[in-house]
């Protein structure tokens, strides 16, 4: 990401990164979801072309990091790939913070494998058996495939850390609200890390935002529970709700945004802002 228009793109894995307690009156600090990190940087950069006097800094770390910063009042916008939990809302209110939710787009959580992995599709039940604690699918042979030897047949699991909105959405939709991931899952820091993990081994499988696809991985179509046809995550299937692992993407502010923050949120929801999301592989809001 080019630092051309006072837009800094910073990634961090700390729970509460320092966003700066004091900042210029027009500065916007935007922190949180790793899923939204790249597009948040692209939005900030494009907005900076129009309004270079409004510096926008963008940092990642996960949805939980964004929420923590919002509650601490150390950022103006928190990016989240999940809704705030009630306990987070309660804590925010105790701190004098009033979280206001803004839906800025939609995303399909894609299931990725190595580009040479021959798997054609998976059902939601099979995904549960692959990733879920107690699930009986441990080897690609359990799915009718052979990667060449016993070691390569062991499925390598790429997951996200538990402060990730992607982690929570996948768990709820695939494993169930009370479901747990297998302990042997590799808990990776970011969306890009999951895709790179899948690209590194023909035995690997993982889940991440659709926008992070590369030429080194394939997206596996998923068959919803009770259906027979596998569905790939696309703009159309996410908008229609037919792809089973999809979710809205949010930005949160402290109260209804006004001034430069309000203008920025409004622009993100406009056709021009939504075109940036779509170009990055996300599903735009209906206009």
What do these predicted ranges mean?
Residues 1-27:
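Short, low-complexity disordered leader/linker segments with a strong preference
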Residues 19-107, 112-287:
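Exported/periplasmic ABC-transporter solute-binding proteins
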């Amino acid at each position: 990401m080019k630092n051309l228009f006072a837009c800094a793109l910073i990634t961090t894995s700390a729970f509460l990164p320092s966003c700066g307690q004091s900042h210029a009156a027009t500065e916007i600090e935007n922190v949180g979801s790793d899923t939204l990190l790249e597009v948040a940087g692209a939005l900030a950069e494009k907005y900076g072309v129009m309004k270079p006097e409004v510096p926008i800094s963008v940092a990642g770390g996960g949805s939980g990091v964004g929420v923590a910063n919002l509650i601490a009042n150390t950022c103006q916008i928190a990016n989240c790939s999940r809704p705030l939990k009630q306990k987070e809302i309660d804590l925010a209110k105790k701190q004098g913070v009033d979280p206001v939710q803004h839906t800025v787009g939609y995303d399909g959580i894609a299931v990725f494998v190595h580009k040479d992995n021959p798997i054609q599709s998976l059902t939601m039940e099979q995904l549960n058996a692959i990733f879920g604690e107690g699930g009986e699918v441990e080897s690609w042979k359990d799915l009718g495939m052979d990667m060449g030897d016993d070691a390569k047949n062991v499925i390598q699991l790429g997951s996200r850390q538990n402060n990730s909105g992607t982690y929570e959405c996948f768990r709820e939709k695939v494993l169930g609200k009370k479901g747990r991931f297998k302990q042997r899952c590799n808990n990776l820091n970011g969306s890009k890390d999951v895709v790179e993990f899948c690209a590194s081994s023909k035995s690997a499988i993982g889940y991440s935002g659709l926008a992070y696809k590369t030429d080194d991985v394939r997206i596996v179509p998923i068959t919803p529970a009770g259906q027979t046809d596998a569905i790939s995550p696309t703009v159309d299937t996410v908008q229609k709700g037919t792809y089973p692992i999809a979710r809205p993407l949010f930005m949160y502010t402290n109260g209804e945004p006004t001034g430069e923050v309000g203008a920025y949120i409004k622009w993100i929801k406009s056709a021009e802002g939504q075109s940036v999301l779509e170009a990055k592989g996300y599903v735009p809001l209906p206009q």
